[in-house]
Amino acid sequence: GNIMAKQTTRAGMDVKEKMYLVLVLCFAAVLITVGAAFFIVRGLGSTTRQNDNTADSAATQEPLVADSSYDKNQNTIDTNKYSSTILEESADAGQSYVDETLFLGDSNTARMYRIFNYCSYDNAIGSVGMSGKSLATYACVQFQGYSGYKTMPEAVALMQPRRVILTFGTNDLSSSYSASSFASDYAKGIKAVQDAYPSVDIIVNAIPPLGQQHSNQNLTQTQVDEYNKALVQMCQDNGWKFLNSAEVLKDSSTGYAKSGYVLSSDGIHLTEQAMDALFTYIRTH
């Protein structure tokens, strides 16, 4: 299951002393680079944590559309081929495993701690609208005592977590951006994280599935599957671990997100029900 981190203990991130508040840019940014679905997180940039679940909404900029000709079996991941790369099921590692993990990602990661309480500002950085290809270069994190904004790799160097779980890719989806190009560009960003803090364990999370009805016609579940298949190979090539969480978020009969797992208003952002399933999966893999 989880890379040796579960058997070893280490002083936790001394983040509260190092970090006043993680401030993420893009106060009202688009989840998807090619249009639609604005998602404004309530209280973004404020100095107090807001736990208002009424903020769990998205303003849809266009009508919901359905994918055409999606074959859920077309890009199935060969779990036997990648058995040394895909994290296997294991005993529940508990909240301590989550607490010593730094979560990096886009707005679905931001929702983990800004809308829900699965992690906190101490161990998550979610930047709305951020893509995997910008991981190495996009400065979006501010620390007390440091001027300007830091990139996520620079933040990892300052925070020194036991491991990082990265969830990017939704904002990279585009018919003109191949899975191989995405994986290659994303890998450069992950290597920047490794270079910034070499002792960190790298776990790449699957891109979450879309709802069968979603707000951006440029997004397809076919491409989500293609990207995830490329991510497993990328992880194997680089000695990283792959968290195949899509398997618990997907409806096995359709290949799309399970009913109730994405917001009905956009078919993209994960609901609390989905987050609950996701974090159970994280603790047990």
Residue locations for each model-derived region?
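Alpha/beta-hydrolase-fold catalytic nucleophile elbow
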Residues: T167, N205-A206
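Conserved SGNH/GDSL esterase-like catalytic core that processes O-acyl groups on lipids
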Residues: A91, Q95-S184
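N-terminal Lys/Arg-rich, disordered targeting/topogenic segments
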Residues: G1-Y20
